[in-house]
Design a protein with these regions (language model features):
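The feature marks the mature, well-folded catalytic cores of soluble enzymes
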Residues: 1-192
Length: 192
């Protein structure tokens, strides 16, 4: 007896004209899925930390991101406020209910009005922490979960992402390794 899932997959396989996989082929595929073999890592994803940070910044800017470097995390609220003012954007922001992000002194800047939680259609600007940044492509990796509502990544018109230098990795392979490690530590991250 086949489950509904097996019936659907069997119908797809038949429509593609593919024979059923042999036991050895199934075993090899399962081994590959569980062992997480690394793919080819391009040269631009390798290098010293300073090189990777510069590569990330260049690639992110090439993808139309604004990159602002601050001296420490305490300076993040002021940098966000300055960016919003300089670009004539709303100063009402929705923060991810992330422990370290919401622990910053957002009230030190009288121009910002903050809300903590998920985003709704009225929210124009969100501020979230990144899970990682990929130097290879300038990609920001966002996570989702109770402290990182995925609506903050997609609903507001403007998304400010706080990324620490230590979160910048060379390749996607490093992101997947960090994500697997975080999930083993019980943090329950997913990538939207």
């Amino acid at each position: 007896f086949m489950s509904s899932r097996e019936q659907i997959l069997d119908a797809i396989r038949q429509s593609l004209g593919r024979p059923e996989l042999s036991t050895d082929a199934k075993r090899a595929l399962n081994q590959q899925i569980t062992s997480h073999p690394a793919n080819l890592v391009p040269a631009r994803a390798k290098g010293e930390r300073a090189q990777l940070i510069k590569q990330f910044q260049n690639m992110a800017q090439a993808a139309a991101c604004t990159v602002e470097t601050v001296s420490n995390l305490v300076a993040v609220p002021a940098a966000v406020s300055q960016f919003l003012r300089a670009n004539n954007l709303p100063t009402r922001i929705t923060l991810a209910p992330d422990e370290w992000l919401s622990g910053l002194d957002w009230n030190s800047n009288n121009l910002l009005k903050t809300k903590i939680g998920s985003a709704d259609i009225a929210d124009m600007v969100s501020v979230t922490p990144a899970f990682a940044g990929v130097a290879e492509t300038g990609t920001l990796v966002a996570s989702s979960g109770s402290a990182h509502p995925t609506t903050l990544n997609f609903v507001p018109d403007y998304h400010v992402v706080v990324l620490r230098h230590t979160q910048i990795v060379g390749s996607y392979e490093e992101v997947w390794a960090r994500l697997r490690k975080a999930n083993k530590q019980g943090r329950g991250f997913t990538v939207p």
